[in-house]
Amino acid sequence: FMNTQLFFNPVNPQQKDFWHRDCQYDYDVDDQMKVIMETQVLHLRVPIFDEPGMELIPGTHKRWDNEEEYNVRQEENGKVSSDDISGGKQIPLAAGDLLVFSADMIHRGRYGLDRLALDILIFDSAADYVDYVDDDCLPTPAMLSNISDPRLFMNTLHLKSMLCS
């Protein structure tokens, strides 16, 4: 378990939705190429209201960008990250749906309607992501005792304790 997040429309209504891999915010391009081949972060999205959903480039969690994807995502050669990418699959979501995808896949949230979604991120425990775990997202010991199968959280707590020792 890594954290939970709430996603909503940007404050600036002029902001366009943009293609990215979550790992691009923490790694340079060379390291991104390694990360997507070695580890994965699982992203679970549950919309609170109907929303335009997500757009994904299938298979990109296991391969590097082609020229078009790279240019758009990195805003090179006259492209911007909000440009359409051929091969993108839009997945509209209704309130209560569950979308599961790799955060390392090229993707973008689609803005519009009253977008509000709860996202849950789960990391590969073999990876070096424990420093991204937000303590505020972890259950207390009292909460853990009420969870029928707390192994996911127990694993994260164990990894965090190893980091601190």
Language model features with spans:
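Non-heme Fe(II)/2-oxoglutarate
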Residues: 105-165
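Non-heme Fe(II) oxygenase catalytic core, chiefly the N-lobe of the double-stranded beta-helix
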Residues: 1-97, 108-113, 120-132
